[in-house]
Design a protein with these regions (language model features):
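Class I SAM-dependent methyltransferase Rossmann-like catalytic core
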Residues: 62-83
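Conserved alpha-helix/loop element of class I SAM-dependent methyltransferases that forms part
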Residues: 78-96
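A short SAM/SAH-binding and catalytic strip from SAM-dependent methyltransferases
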Residues: 170-180
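N-terminal auxiliary segments of SAM/dcSAM-dependent transferases
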Residues: 1-59
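Conserved SAM-binding strand-loop segment of SAM-dependent methyltransferases
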Residues: 148-159
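Conserved class I S-adenosyl-L-methionine
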Residues: 95-105, 123
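A short acidic, Gly/Pro-enriched loop at the edge of an enzyme's catalytic core
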Residues: 160-172
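Conserved SAM-binding loop of SAM-dependent methyltransferases across substrates and taxa
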Residues: 106-118
């Protein structure tokens, strides 16, 4: 079984942006270019508004498609893998030590740190909100099993209210979290 670490840019977000770009272009053509049902100043205003919306949506869509391809684990750049592996290289747990990964998403960083630290264990927490619905506790557990990692566990948690006593962890990681 192969792990499924997903992508930092959710597919649903890409589809929504593409739909928004197409809609703003259609409205620009209908009201701005062809002036169907409108004329004069209103046509100009609608043309400017929908033209601006189209440009903004198209540029943001272009950037998100580029980011999606860059962050893909299966793509050419594999930027996520480089970042995850590069971060995990800096985590060294003592014998019996415990590390915490805040905002673990699909478990990639938690699992990478656990693989590099078989003498310890890693705990991954995430709130797994609706904006990243493809990430879940179950996905993390499946990814750990796919990687053959047994020294990683996952649980629901909140980065703003960590439910652990002070001094519980020997290392703490967090990646792609504080942008939300």
């Amino acid at each position: 079984m192969k792990p499924d670490y997903k992508n930092w840019i959710p597919k649903g977000m890409l589809f929504s942006l593409i739909a928004g770009t197409a809609l703003s272009l259609a409205l620009l053509l209908v009201f701005g270019a062809f002036g169907i049902g409108v004329s004069g100043k209103l046509r100009v205003v609608l043309g400017v508004v929908f033209g601006g919306a189209f440009v903004v949506c198209a540029k943001y869509t272009q950037w998100c498609v580029y980011a999606y391809r860059s962050f893909s684990y299966d793509g050419e750049r594999k930027l996520s893998k480089q970042i995850i592996d590069g971060t995990a290289e800096h985590i060294t747990l003592p014998e019996g030590g415990v590390g915490l990964d805040v905002g673990c998403g699909s478990g990639a960083l938690t699992i990478a740190c656990a693989k590099r630290n078989p003498q310890g264990k890693m705990v991954g927490i995430d709130r797994w909100g609706k904006e990243y619905a493809s990430f879940s506790l179950s996905l993390c557990e499946k990814n750990a099993a796919a990687e053959g990692v047994r020294n990683a566990s996952f649980r629901r948690g909140n980065a703003l209210k960590l439910d652990f006593p002070d001094e519980s962890f020997d290392a703490v990681t967090s990646n792609y979290v504080y942008h939300n």
